[in-house]
Amino acid sequence: MTAGSVCAPQIIPLRVPQPGKANHEIDTNTLLEMKSDTPDVNIYYTLDGSKPDFLKKVGSGENNTFKYVKPITLPDGKIQVKAVAVSKDCRQSGIVTKVFQVDYEPPKMVSSEDNVEDALKGFSKQELKNGFVGPKLRKKYKNAENKSTWNVNLRRLADLKVGERADPKTLKDLRFAESPLEIPAYHEGASARLPTHQAQSPGFAHITGQKSLTSTEIMRIQRETDFLKCAHCLASRPSDPFARFCHECGAPVPPIFGYRLPPPEGAQMGLCAECGSMVPMNTPICVVCEAPLAPQLRPQASLYLKERVICRTCGTGNPAHLRYCVTCEGPLPPTQEQWLCNGDEVPHPPARNGETISCSRCGCQNLWEASFCDWCGAMLGISASHSVCPKCGASNHLTARFCGSCGIYVKSITRFRMHNSLAIVAGAPRPFPEPRSAWQSLNVPLPTSASGSKKDTGTQTSGLFYPSGKLLAKKELEAASHRQRQEKMSDHRPVLTAVSPGRGYWRKQLDHISAHLRSYAQNNPEFRALIAEPRMGKLISATVHEDGYEVSIRLNYIQVSNKSLYFNKSVNLSDHFLSSVTEGGNGLYDSRSSLVSAYSQSVSDTPESIKKMKNLKAKSFLVNPEPLTPENKLLLEEVGSSGKGRLSVLEQLLDEGADPNCCDSQGRPAVIVAVVNKHYEAIPVLAQRGADIDQQWGPFRNTALHEATLLGLEGRESIATLLGCNANAQKKNTRGQTAYDIALEMGDDLTSSLFAAKFTQGLEDQLSPPGNRILGDS
């Protein structure tokens, strides 16, 4: 928060948290408190969703802004509360918006005297400070006869409108009744008549919910405090008993019956020298001992102190007729007598509808916004103790915004001048509520310039670019769209939930997985270290398995090696080339086995072959598994864990049309299924019928030779059979390992010897003539 800014108000419901209910769900009896961390600020709020406007004038539209005085209640329904904090120098905070769902709750009917005492104690200290305290506790209820007489007289006045005069006899009966302050019947009637004015403004709907006290409580509060509030803005009633309009909102206020003059001020009381009693000083004799007060008010000496001028340099008091200090000989500030003696005429600018202030030193008339005199430089003090209405001339309080007599909007000149003086003392900038001119224009004759001094000069205007309004609006739209794109591209972190929703909400399911994966990585350093190492490409496959207790999710990404080569899954790549459609599948390669061998050869070949492989723009993607034919299903069952791997059955199924390259539900080829289940006799049969023995599968892209090596001693026969069928021992998986590397890593000497024998035989075949090559190297 920047220096000097006003803290935004807080809207807090005063209640104990209830289980099962959100913070915005309240009832009509719940009090709402508004407060700001910045001291000495006023809070204004609205209840209809409009922006609070605390400077709105009467006649410029419907005024729905209220000043916060004490905790309020809301009517039932969905209520949107907007509040803003305003300091004394008109600095505003940000607007706070809060929406409440208010349920109707009948008011609590309390009639005991103890609960009334608790209700009286529940008011805030701010209201007690503002004067919400009665002088003393009144006497208890009078008899029923006095009450009935008082209520009858009140019924006569209940039909009067605001501003009308009442019958003198009725006022006399009210003034001399036994209990002139017990007027609950009038307030109930008056509150019933107020909705005619409130119906025009929906923002006043909370007033009725706020007056939820019973008649006994209202009677007790009225009797103990003798305090009324404005029914529209809940501000304190004007201290003037004859005021007809509220000083804060300008709404009409009902008259008070039984007017009482305010008590005399403290300055009118004095101590009598004869009897020592505090008596009024505006009487000729003491009201206690009847001693004359005129001699006591006279001064004891006939010599009066002359006016002194304080030196601004050393602080010495000097006679008023001197111009230089007698101590430091510094210049003294001139007084009004010196201005008049010197013959300097003090200027009097034209009055602006009474908006001027007179200087106490030289008498110059200055603007009401000025803090110092334009002529002598003296600070302008607050001379008036009240503001004057420019329309009717009535006196109002310094802080009054509306005239209490005629109800028009009043520019509180003295109030703004007081704020300006306070701001100067505090070192803060003065607020200027509206534009003003700091100086008055003066007709000063200027010397005429010679005609020969004029020269014609030119400025460059060509080549300068002046943007048009459309271009500026277009730039603003582009900036707004750019901000929206940046917000959409921002990192979205889903909320960590305990249980995912399921039931088809796949987006929420993914958010649940992402949030828990992030949380698991933050809490497990080992997993963080493992997941941070590999370089991954795009996602090529994803599977979900559930067994009633756990849900397993497996994601397969392409791993990027140091040479930035993508080892894509070779699932029938020849079916996705253009030649497979135009030339029947034999336009680029002779068979599937040749394509796979060429691809594996290009991976482990020279960089020239790598460049050639990059030119093949074949897009690799997963093919949805086609439903297995009965022949393929029987073939996989025969080489599976439940089958026996009988050669006669396999040959019969292959003759009937079974595919030797078919895959099971997990994507494993038939050759790998036979190797995993130790049916090594079936490998030559499948290889002779066209099975690709170097086909890769799984997340690690292992071949049948890799799977046989992982079996250890149990896969020795399968390794020998695969090598006999000319399996590629140089084929690498995604980890960059061949089957021989896996055997060396496992420390299996017997398996390593099989690969060493194969390598030796391959070297001999390269050195021998072509006619002596073994069968199967065609």
From Swiss-Prot:
Q: Name one GO cellular component term.
A: centrosome
Zn finger spans (DZANK-type): 230-289, 359-407
- Matching InterPro entries: Ankyrin_rpt, Ankyrin_rpt-contain_sf, DZAN1, DZR, Fn3_assoc_repeat
Q: What is its main location?
A: cytoplasm
Query: GO molecular function terms here?
Result: zinc ion binding
Specify the domain of life of the species encoding this protein: Eukaryota
| Key word Lipid metabolism present | no
Which spans of this chain does UniProt mark as ANK repeats? 631-662, 666-695
Q: Keywords in UniProt for this one?
A: ANK repeat, Cell projection, Cytoplasm, Cytoskeleton, Metal-binding, Phosphoprotein, Repeat, Zinc, Zinc-finger
The entry's localization annotation reads: Cytoplasm, Cytoskeleton, Microtubule organizing center, Centrosome; Cytoplasm, Cytoskeleton, Cilium basal body
Residue numbers bearing the Phosphoserine modification: S179, S201, S768
Q: How does it assemble?
A: Interacts with NINL. Associates with DYNC1H1 and multiple dynein intermediate and light chains as well as actin-binding proteins.
Function of this protein?
Involved in vesicle transport in photoreceptor cells.
The protein in question is named Double zinc ribbon and ankyrin repeat-containing protein 1
Native species: Mus musculus
